Amino acid sequence: MFLRLAMTCGALVLALMIGAAQAQSGYPNRVITLVVPYPAGGTADLLCRFAADKAGSNLGQQAVVENRPGGGGGRVGTESVLRASPDGYTLLCAAQLTFSVTHLLFSKASFDTRALEPISVLAAYPLILIGRESLPFDNLADVIAYARANPGKINYGHQGKGQTGHLLGELLMLKGEFRMTEIPYRGSAPAINDLLAGNIDIVPDYLLANKSNIDAGKLKLLATGSRERLKDYPRVATIAETLPGVYADTWMAVAAPPGTPKEITTKVSRAIAHGFQDPELRSRIRALEAEALAGTPDEMRDLIRQSFETWAPVIDAAKIVVE
C-alpha cells in the first residue's frame, strides 16, 4: 500500500513537472499584459506600447498595455507585478529607479523590486537642466559659481520627492559642492508652469516635454545629462563637461515577476530585441529624443547596477526617504 501511494505521488509530481515544462515550451498561448505603473501618454508609456506591439508580433501572441498608476513612484502597478504568477503573462514596464533604488527610497514598502527578473532595457533618454527665461545664467558652470558664492539663493523645482528630477538636483549639489533651495511639486507639469511664469529658477526634467519651449526661447537649456552634446543643441554643454564623470539619463525596461523561468525571460527579451531593430520604430524612438537599446537580461542587470551606483550615494547623502 505504501509503495502504491509512493508511486502514485511520484507519478503526480512527474506529471506536474512535465506540465510545467510543456507550459514553458508552449509559451505564450494567451494574451500577455505589460503593466505600466504610470498614466497613459508620455514617453514612458509610448515606449512600453512599442515593446508590447513588437513582443506580441514576434511571439505570435497579443500583448497589451495596462496602465496602473498610483502610490508614488508607480508602487501600485509595480507591486501588482511582484505578486503576479511567474508564468510570463504579466510583466512590468517601468523606469530605471523602479529597478535600482526603490527599496532605498521606500524603506517601509512591503515589496522589494530587486526580486524582479530582468528582461530588456528598451530605450534611454537624457535628463536636462532648464532655467527660466530671465535667469541671468546660460550654463551650469555659471549657476554653480553663483550658488557657491550665494548658498540657497538659487532654487530648483522637481516633480516630487524621490523622483528623478529630485535626485538629479541633489546629485548636482553633491558633486558640485553647492546648495540650491529645493521646491517639490506634484508632477512635472506644475513645476514647468511655475518655471515658465518665472516663479522658480531651475527644473531638472526631460527634453521631449520641454523642447518646444526651449526652441521658442521661453526656457533656457543649461546642460544635458548625455555623454555627448545633443545634435540639436551643439552649443549646450553636458553636465560632465562641468562636473566630470556625472551623467544623468533614465531608461525604460521590462521585467517579470520573481521566479519566472529563464526560458521565458530570454524568449521575451529576444522578441523585443528583434522588434526594436525595425528602422521605422527606431526613427519613432529618436523622435521621442530617446535611444533604442533593447538588450539582454544580463545587460539590464548591468544597467541596474550602474543606476544603483549613481543614485544610492545621493539618496544616502541627502537622506531621502519617501513615506
What is the meaning of each model-derived region?
Residues 23-115, 153, 177-202, 206, ...:
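N-terminal (or domain-start) structured segment
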Residues 95-96, 133, 206-208, 226-227, ...:
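Short secondary-structure boundary segments
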Residues 6-19:
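Bacterial N-terminal signal peptides
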Residues 1-5:
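Positively charged n-region of N-terminal signal peptides that target proteins for export
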Residues 46, 50, 54, 76, ...:
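Extracytoplasmic/secreted proteins, especially bacterial periplasmic and envelope-associated proteins
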Residues 83-89, 104-190, 239, 244, ...:
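Hinge/capping helix and adjacent helix->loop/strand transition within the periplasmic-binding protein
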Residues 29-31, 174-178, 235, 262-323:
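An extracytoplasmic/periplasmic, membrane-proximal ligand-sensing/linker region
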